[in-house]
Amino acid sequence: MKIILSPAKTMADPEKTMLRPEIESEIIMTRPVFEQRAQALIRLLKGFSEIELKALFKVSDAIARKTLDQINGFGETRPVPAIFAFQGAVYKALAPEAFTGESLVFCRQNLVILSALYGVLNPFDAVFAHRLDFTCKLECGANMTLRKFWTSPIHEWFDENLAADEFIVNLASDEYASLVTKGGLKARVITLAFMEKKGGVLKTVAAHSKQARGLFLRQIVQQRVTEPGMIKSFKVAGYTYDGKISQKNRWVFVLK
């Protein structure tokens, strides 16, 4: 079983990222499997000026400047293990900095972080600060969008690392999950969805859903879940499994 997670735009400051001594010894950073493809994207981005980056990413002057600095200095700063490199709402709820060494090893064996720059990341992979996501209209070649650039390599990686009778538990955002949920993989993909009632209607509230994805992943890690069916019994932060509205490959958890 593999669990997929999306990255976050907010990234850790490598100079301020300090791991507890008892877990730092457990982490030996590895190199991303698609490191060469990531380097090719960085070379492509180095051809953009600050003004062009601002338009490409639709960001402020300050963020465009920071992004340019990250691109030009890519690989020159201290890398951070992927599981500690991202700091969005999902990762705050996950709180990997509080994990035991055994929990981090479980993550290394079972968690995959999808990335628009690196393709797939192991939690222990060395990551440099960057800004890139699939909303970015970066042309990677003739009729080659960023999504097309990554679809085949990511599919091949999952097919090589998972048998047809294995599972992928999807805790990624739709932007990243669509790389694996639109078919073509040998393994079965099960998406966990989180909903709550608003005005008598079940809805997905983005901010709450992000937090729930992090909390559910934390529970999966702490309980060392290796069979997806175990997740149906989870009662986390008020969310419980609703079999009436769930589907075969989309399990819905409703906030009570």
Curated annotation (Swiss-Prot):
Listed HAMAP family: UPF0246
Biological-process GO terms, alphabetical: response to hydroperoxide
Entry's family note: Belongs to the UPF0246 family.
Superkingdom of this protein's organism: Bacteria
Signal peptide extent: none
Name used for this protein in its record: UPF0246 protein HRM2_41860
GO cellular component: cytosol
InterPro entries: YaaA
